[in-house]
């Protein structure tokens, strides 16, 4: 009888790969996001928004999830959303936060101004540049490409 080693992790990853959603934007703990979830009421469905700060990202693969915290009527409310859930309709990043921790559970004890998170201006600028490139690519001919091509033509003419 021959012993055959089976890599269960590789098999599990290959099965999970089909169920992983890739359409979420990149966000990190400290970012303020709006998560729209599908809610079924009777025979109709609607989207319900939950807006707050991402305080943790847990897991990998299809088991990956993120925790969002908000203050509602003076009470802290936290919800855990699976990345690959079909009930999560859309995730929108509203603000980029600058933090030094991966888990922001300390925010649970802070109140008011102490619970604020600084804005990460460098990531905001990178997002704006990336959005501009996407818009230019969608238009087909970007203004920066036309400017560089006209500058190249001017230097060749001299």
UniProtKB/Swiss-Prot annotation:
By its UniProt entry, which InterPro entries does this protein fall under? Ribosomal_bL19, Ribosomal_bL19_CS, Ribosomal_bL19_sf, Translation_prot_SH3-like_sf
- Which GO-annotated molecular functions does the record name? structural constituent of ribosome
Which key words tag this protein in UniProt? Ribonucleoprotein, Ribosomal protein
Q: Which GO terms describe its cellular component?
A: cytosolic large ribosomal subunit
Query: Which BP terms in the Gene Ontology apply to this protein?
Result: translation
Checking Pfam families in the record gives:
Ribosomal_L19
Q: Where is the composition biased (Basic and acidic residues)?
A: 119-129
Comp. bias regions, Polar residues: 140-158
Q: Which Gene3D superfamilies match?
A: 2.30.30.790
Q: Does the keyword RNA-binding apply?
A: no
Region annotation (Disordered) maps to: 119-158
Q: Which HAMAP family match?
A: Ribosomal_bL19 (MF_00402)
The family assignment reads:
Belongs to the bacterial ribosomal protein bL19 family.
The protein's name in its UniProt record? Large ribosomal subunit protein bL19
What species is this protein from?
Answer: Deinococcus geothermalis (strain DSM 11300 / CIP 105573 / AG-3a)
């Amino acid at each position: 009888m021959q012993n055959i080693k089976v890599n269960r992790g590789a098999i599990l990853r290959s099965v999970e790969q089909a169920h992983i959603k890739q359409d979420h934007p990149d966000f990190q703990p400290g970012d303020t996001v709006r998560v729209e979830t599908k809610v079924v009421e009777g025979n109709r469905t609607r989207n319900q928004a939950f807006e707050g700060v991402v305080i943790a990202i847990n897991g990998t693969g299809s088991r990956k999830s993120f925790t969002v915290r908000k203050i509602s009527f003076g009470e802290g409310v936290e919800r855990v959303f699976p990345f690959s859930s079909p009930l999560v309709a859309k995730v929108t990043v509203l603000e980029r936060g600058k933090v030094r921790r991966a888990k922001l559970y300390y925010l649970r004890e802070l109140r008011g101004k102490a619970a604020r998170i600084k804005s990460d201006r460098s990531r905001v600028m990178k997002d704006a540049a990336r959005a501009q490139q996407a818009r230019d690519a969608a238009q087909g001919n970007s203004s920066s490409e036309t400017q560089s091509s006209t500058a190249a033509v001017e230097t060749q003419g001299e």
